[in-house]
Amino acid sequence: MDHVPPPQQMFQHVTAYWVTQLMGTAARLGLADCLEAGPLRVAEIATTVGANADALYRVMRACTAVGVFTEQADKTFANNALSQTLRSNVPGSMRNFAIAQSAPGHWRPWEQLTEAVRSGKSTAHAALGHELFE
């Protein structure tokens, strides 16, 4: 196993939320479901899911960079073993989990973690406008 330098490790930790948001976006748009029948060009995917083709291409490339989806020639993408978990109609689907974990109700309270540690109080109300369990 190659040694990953500490700055690179920290970069991966600090930017991990980017991946969560990528997975949530892929799940919400139904990208893996769109590719269920086989590879498609990004323009076709964009039309099917109602997205801007240029923006979607950047998202698909970012997903590919973290091992989700496979990019082929001519801006064509296909599912792989990891993206299959974002399909809605497969056993063990993680699609709804990706949507939930990337939703504001899950990540906004984390924005207030420093204040919660300082005060010892829940910051859910400040982050969400209500307590988590009312």
Regions found by a protein language model. Name each.
Residues 4-50, 54-134:
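Conserved Class I S-adenosyl-L-methionine-dependent methyltransferase catalytic core
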